[in-house]
Amino acid sequence: MEYKRFKTRQIKVGNVLIGGDAPISVQSMLFTKTRDIEGSLEQINRLYFAGANIVRLACLDMADARALKEIKAKSPLPLIVDIHFNHNLAVYCAEFIDGVRINPGNIGSKENIKEVVKACKERGIPIRIGINHGSIEKQFSDKFGYGVDAMLESAMYNIKLLEDLDFFDIKISMKTSDAQKTIEAYERLRPLCDYPFHLGVTEAGTKFHSTVKSSIALGNLLLKGIGDTMRVSMTGELEEEIRVARAILQDSGVQKSGVNIISCPTCGRIQSDLLSAIKIVEEKTKHIKEPLNISVMGCVVNALGEAKGADVAIAFGKNQGLVIRHGEVVAKLKESELVDRFLAEVEDEVKSRAVKE
């Protein structure tokens, strides 16, 4: 299946391009109190090393806003301020931040939005219209309830409001906590505008539930060419948000990066400690950003076939096994020596590619 992405307008968040032909970026949001400068910077740095492109922070009051200014000066990543209820905080933060997210359901009057637009326009920073099914404006929820129809009405109303103010650096999100409704919301809005979309399932839950919901919703949309930036929302799992997001991009075939591990589910034919080997391989290869296919198989039934499509592979047998690189056996070793040799071949493969580039 050929992947064809919907062509959107391009905006810029700090040094990250979103939309157009830019790669799909991965975002996360801190769970620190923003006034905790040291703690916030610690989480930002963790996200930076995990492979995030953009970070969002909550701003509840002026103490948060002043702290955010200091955090921004030290952050290795572009920062977006997340504003609810108090538009004055958005106006203040627009002086130094890379982007503003507003919730139309609680930001207040048109005059409030005008002030935010004016501040962002002067700085040349984008605004995300963050539609959330749980906080739709009363004028739309009274008429349509809290479903997708109300979300679409809110989105189009707020897009027009910004456009009428001659503001077009816009990004849009249409988040619900339900995978099917999220897919429907983005699909129905896509033909109605050409602004970049920020994908996400809101309040998706802990690691297990979030991974399932986000994979269904985001993977489905990405395969249809919808989406320019994304977040996998996960309760209390910063690095895992990035890891799962990157895996969705990779396994949907949209964006290749990092290691793709092929491993068998195990059965009665296994005569080795495959589970321990897989855990070691996952941990030792998670730092690799180069697109790489590796295979760790427990017996000969599918091992050699999988190895032909892998850059580096292990085929375990009884007390011994093979290390295979690009379909060629490079070593036959005792089981205790296999993983170390395999990892050495993986690192050598990464280095050899770097030299070629």
UniProtKB/Swiss-Prot annotation:
Broadest EC class assigned to this enzyme: oxidoreductase
InterPro entries: Dihydropteroate_synth-like_sf, IspG_bac, IspG_bac-typ, NO2/SO3_Rdtase_4Fe4S_sf
GO MF annotations in UniProt: 4 iron, 4 sulfur cluster binding; 4-hydroxy-3-methylbut-2-en-1-yl diphosphate synthase activity (ferredoxin); 4-hydroxy-3-methylbut-2-enyl-diphosphate synthase activity (flavodoxin); iron ion binding
Cofactor annotation remark: Binds 1 [4Fe-4S] cluster.
Signal peptide start and end residues: none
EC number: 1.17.7.3
Biological or metabolic pathway of the protein: Isoprenoid biosynthesis; isopentenyl diphosphate biosynthesis via DXP pathway; isopentenyl diphosphate from 1-deoxy-D-xylulose 5-phosphate: step 5/6
Residues reported to bind [4Fe-4S] cluster: C264, C267, C299, E306
Cofactor(s) this protein cannot do without: [4Fe-4S] cluster
Superkingdom field: Bacteria
Reactions it catalyzes: (2E)-4-hydroxy-3-methylbut-2-enyl diphosphate + oxidized [flavodoxin] + H2O + 2 H(+) = 2-C-methyl-D-erythritol 2,4-cyclic diphosphate + reduced [flavodoxin]
GO term, biological process aspect, one: isopentenyl diphosphate biosynthetic process, methylerythritol 4-phosphate pathway
Keyword line: 4Fe-4S, Iron, Iron-sulfur, Isoprene biosynthesis, Metal-binding, Oxidoreductase
Pfam family, one: GcpE
Family named by the database record: Belongs to the IspG family.
Function statement: Converts 2C-methyl-D-erythritol 2,4-cyclodiphosphate (ME-2,4cPP) into 1-hydroxy-2-methyl-2-(E)-butenyl 4-diphosphate.
Protein name: 4-hydroxy-3-methylbut-2-en-1-yl diphosphate synthase (flavodoxin)
Organism the protein comes from: Campylobacter jejuni (strain RM1221)
Lineage of source species: Bacteria, Pseudomonadati, Campylobacterota, Epsilonproteobacteria, Campylobacterales
